[in-house]
Amino acid sequence: MSPQTETKASVGFKAGVKDYKLTYYTPEYQPQDTDILAAFRVTPQPGVPSEEAGAAVAAESSTGTWTTVWTDGLTSSDRYKGRCYHIDPVPGEDNQYICYVAYPLDLFEEGSVTNMFTSIVGNVFGFKALRALRLEDLRIPIAYIKTFQGPPHGIQVERDKLNKYGRPLLGCTIKPKLGLSAKNYGRAVYECLRGGLDFTKDDENVNSQPFMRWRDRFLFCAEALYKAQAETGEIKGHYFNATAGTCEEMIKRAVFARELGAPIVMHDYLTGGFTANTSLAHYCRDNGLLLHIHRAMHAVIDRQKNHGMHFRVLAKALRLSGGDHIHAGTVVGKLEGERDITLGFVDLLRDDHTEIDSSRGIYFTQSWVSTPGVLPVASGGIHVWHMPALTEIFGDDSVLQFGGGTLGHPWGNAPGAVANRVALEACVQARNEGRDLAREGATIIRERSKWSPELAAACEVWKEIKFEFPAVDVLDKKKN
């Protein structure tokens, strides 16, 4: 008998294929404080039991493969395997389940969202035994959170840098998103900031195209920024998009923004990737830059209810990887986002601790210990009539960003900015006086428009604009 054969025999190796549930379905398991916990929405193929489907997810996203291998005997499966420890049927669905999986912390590299996602949302999402699979939520243990830097600065440090308190911050994405020359782009930035906005923003599509190279844009926008600051006496910012084709080029652009004295840069964190984003977040903390995050490509991942990954998971991943702002939908604008679900992940971004709350789609209690919070950004199809609802929904610790709702003003960019600033201050004052923004919002805007011709003009041009379509991703409810 060869030594190799003896080794196989000594560990009781038996070739073949066995059901995943024999090893990876463990309903008696009690999750540990150090485990990463995942809630998967699993839709098995017809004839596949829920226990087998949940166990398959646990196996294929941790130590398992399709057949027994003799090298299993060279390690401790019980120490490293993922475990499906609980299964709940989804209300109103005949063949859909929420499967809870616990992963030992040793499966993941410290401080790496990239490695965490490679395992948990890797090849298992193409597994043939499943018709569809969606990651609904993660519980990140404190022991793992402490291996990440997190946001470069956080909410309080940003407010101190800007010297702005007691209200949401106001922003604007420069439009048209593509095609402007750097000089005309800088002009629009100046007009918006001069009119009263706190920030202007590069569109996520704007990197360094032939019509406007990044260095030219940075120079003209910096000039606009300083001119507006000098004339208003307020600290202003422009989100310089540092996203690039390589990490080296991305850092070079961030360095140039810092040399210009810019307070903030921007990154498209999903198209750019988590490794690039974490690298940029570390640079921003070391060099005093705020980091604005755009979520371009998120709907490819999170919009379908049965397959992919919910945005609350992407939001948690961003808080680990690092960002001071992130786009989070609007509830009332042109982009997808149900109110309760949106408020659920907004709290996950900002708060130190969130409890399980099925009414908002939160599957796990999550503690962030000392990790700084992230400002949610409401952006996409919003205008002055939305200001009361946005102020009431998102509160002070947010950025309200009006692109077309600023540059689409009939009198020009600066009057559009004035209209938004006046509307915001009216809503904040009314709220502080105890008025109900949800019920009295339209009245509050009309009252203030009597004293602001810019606001009155904006109210007139957008009075009929609504985006009333049903949300695709909604909370689970029993069918009647």
Swiss-Prot record:
Modified residues annotated as N6-carboxylysine in this record: K201
Residues modified to N6,N6,N6-trimethyllysine: K14
Propeptide cleavage-removed residue intervals: 1-2
GO (cellular component) term, any one: chloroplast
Residues that bear N-acetylproline: P3
CDD domains: RuBisCO_large_I (cd08212)
Keyword Chloroplast: yes
UniProt KW keywords: Acetylation, Calvin cycle, Carbon dioxide fixation, Chloroplast, Disulfide bond, Lyase, Magnesium, Metal-binding, Methylation, Monooxygenase, Oxidoreductase, Photorespiration, Photosynthesis, Plastid
Biological function: RuBisCO catalyzes two reactions: the carboxylation of D-ribulose 1,5-bisphosphate, the primary event in carbon dioxide fixation, as well as the oxidative fragmentation of the pentose substrate in the photorespiration process. Both reactions occur simultaneously and in competition at the same active site.
Protein name (database record): Ribulose bisphosphate carboxylase large chain
Organism: Mirabilis jalapa
